Design a protein with these regions (language model features):
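Catalytic center-proximal scaffold of phosphoryl-transfer enzymes
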Residues: 1-291
Length: 291
C-alpha cells in the first residue's frame, strides 16, 4: 500500500510525472511498469467515489465558495467533441477544495455542482458562465477585486499615457484592501467595527464617484472607458463583501488552489482517458483538502 500512496502523492500533490518516480525506483532495484501503475489507478478509482460524495455533501453545507476553472487535456475521443480540451473546475470553501474535470466550460457545470442549493455566494471572476449560473440558481456573485486591479495594471503597461491615471486606481484598490483588513480585525468590537465599516463605505463611494466622473469624460481613452464600463457594470458584485464580512475581496483562494494542478498539467500534459481524468480530479480533491 505504501507504494500506491507514494505514487499518488508524488503525482497529484507534487506534480511529478509518474515515469520519473518509476525511473528512480528502478535505480534502486524496484522495477514497476507504467502499465501496472495505470491498472492499479484504474482499480483504485472507484474506491474514492464515496469520499468524493462526502466532500461534496459537506461543501454544500457551506454558505459561500470560491470558484475558478482552467484548461486541461484529455486524450480520449468523446462523441460530439472535436478537441481534447477539457476544463478543471475548482470550488473552494471552508470545508473542502473540490475539483471536477469536465469537457465543457459552460454554466451547466457549476449549476450541476451546486444542484439542490437555493442560495449562496460564489466568489469568482467575471466569466459569463458564473453569471448565468447565478441567475439560474438564485445565487449571489462576489466579483474579484484582484482582477480589476490587473485591468488597471494592464492599462498602465500598454498605454504609457494612461500610466499615472491607471496607477491612481491601483492605489485606490490598495487602500480598499487596507481599510477592509482594518475593519475585519475589530469584528469582535461592535463600535469599532461599525466605525471602520463606515470608513470602507466612504472609500467605496469615493471610488464609485471617480468611476462615474471618468465615464462622463468624453475625452476618456477608449481602452480606459472599457475598463471603467466593466467596473461600473460589476460594481454590485464587487461590493458584496460590505454586507458579508466573511466574503473575501478577491478570488485568490481558488487561484491558489489550482496552482499545484497547473504544475502537474505542464509536467504530464493532462489525462490519457476519461476515467483517469476523473481519478485525477478525485486525487486533487482529497490531497489538497487534507494537505
Amino acid at each position: 500500500m505504501s507504494i500506491w500512496t507514494e505514487l499518488i502523492v508524488d503525482k497529484f500533490l507534487y506534480g511529478r510525472p509518474t515515469h520519473r518516480l518509476l525511473q528512480s525506483w528502478k535505480g534502486l532495484g524496484l522495477d514497476v511498469s507504467a502499465g501496472t501503475v495505470a491498472g492499479g489507478f484504474a482499480h483504485l478509482a472507484p474506491m474514492f467515489a464515496p469520499l468524493m460524495q462526502a466532500f461534496l455533501d459537506r461543501q454544500h453545507l457551506d454558505s459561500h465558495w470560491h470558484a475558478d476553472e482552467t484548461g486541461w487535456k484529455v486524450f480520449e475521443r468523446v462523441d460530439g467533441k472535436k478537441t481534447n480540451r477539457w476544463y478543471l473546475w475548482v470550488y473552494r470553501s471552508n470545508s473542502a477544495i473540490y475539483f471536477d474535470l469536465e469537457p465543457s466550460r459552460a454554466a451547466a457545470v457549476p449549476e450541476a455542482h451546486f444542484k439542490g442549493l437555493s442560495e449562496g455566494i460564489v466568489i469568482c471572476d467575471r466569466y459569463s458562465a458564473y453569471k448565468k449560473m447565478a441567475r439560474t440558481l438564485g445565487f449571489l456573485l462576489a466579483f474579484c477585486w484582484a482582477h480589476v486591479r490587473r485591468d488597471f495594471l494592464t492599462l498602465a503597461q500598454g498605454y504609457p499615457q494612461l500610466e499615472a491615471w491607471s496607477l491612481a486606481w491601483v492605489e485606490r484598490i490598495g487602500i480598499l484592501y487596507h481599510l477592509n483588513k482594518v475593519r475585519l480585525a475589530v469584528q469582535g468590537d461592535g463600535v469599532a467595527f461599525a466605525r471602520d465599516t463606515a470608513s470602507v463605505e466612504r472609500h467605496l463611494q469615493s471610488m464609485s464617484a471617480h468611476c462615474d466622473l471618468a465615464l462622463q469624460d468624453k475625452a476618456l481613452h477608449e481602452a480606459a472607458r472599457k475598463v471603467m464600463t466593466s467596473l461600473r457594470h460589476h460594481w454590485h458584485g464587487l461590493s458584496v463583501f460590505m454586507a458579508h464580512p466573511d466574503i473575501a475581496l478577491d478570488n485568490n483562494s481558488a487561484e491558489n488552489a489550482v496552482r499545484g494542478p497547473v504544475v502537474g498539467r505542464k509536467n504530464y500534459y493532462g489525462s490519457g482517458s476519461i476515467w483517469s481524468a476523473q481519478f485525477t480530479a478525485s486525487m486533487f480533491t482529497v490531497l489538497l483538502t487534507l494537505d
